[in-house]
Amino acid sequence: MASTISAYKEKMKELSVLSLICSCFYTQPHPNTIYQYGDMEVKQLDKRASGQSFEVILKSPSDLSPESPMLSSPPKKKDTSLEELQKRLEAAEERRKTQEAQVLKQLAERREHEREVLHKALEENNNFSRQAEEKLNYKMELSKEIREAHLAALRERLREKELHAAEVRRNKEQREEMSG
């Protein structure tokens, strides 16, 4: 029986209560129905053909034997002197100022970045406008030159026609004078 108790103690360390109950279904019956393991008791409730049922009772911490270690209380804080409190306050103030300076620095960097982006956008817009204006002026100049060249060609053809007409008239007059 002592080996059975030690086996159950080992199982309790390794298995959950449900696993313990399940493992108890196939054990050999014992005359004593109450088992004590450290800070818990296991009572056999009833035996049936389908299996056995047990009740597991945990003892409260106050009922534990003096052998078990007592819970240690949290360590007490030592009294802090006025100088230590002042140092802590100064350190906290310094941390607050540092954090505030970091936030202000981040805001300044963000504003500077926004200014740079805006400046770049304006510069690109101005460049685009200037390029569009230059392109338009070039097209207008080219169109003007083509128009002037076309007009000059028309004038030249008109002058040639007038010269030809004058020559034809002269030739006609000469023929009339000769024939007539």
From Swiss-Prot:
Residue list for modification Phosphoserine: 50, 60, 65, 68, 72-73, 81
Residue positions of covalent lipid attachment, annotated as S-palmitoyl cysteine: 22, 24
Molecular functions (GO terms): tubulin binding
Pfam families xref list: Stathmin
Keyword annotations: Cell projection, Coiled coil, Cytoplasm, Golgi apparatus, Lipoprotein, Palmitate, Phosphoprotein
Recorded GO CC terms: cytosol; Golgi apparatus; growth cone
Extent of Low complexity compositional bias: 60-74
Positions of the SLD domain: 38-180
Sections of the chain in a coiled coil: 76-179
Highest taxon in the source lineage: Eukaryota
UniProt region (Disordered), positions on chain: 59-82
Location within or outside the cell: Golgi apparatus; Cell projection, Growth cone; Cell projection, Axon; Cytoplasm, Cytosol
PANTHER family: STATHMIN, STATHMIN-3
Family: Belongs to the stathmin family.
Quaternary state and interactors: Interacts with STAT3. Interacts with CLU (secreted form); this interaction may act as an important modulator during neuronal differentiation.
Role summary: Exhibits microtubule-destabilizing activity, which is antagonized by STAT3.
Name by which UniProt lists this protein: Stathmin-3
Organism: Macaca fascicularis
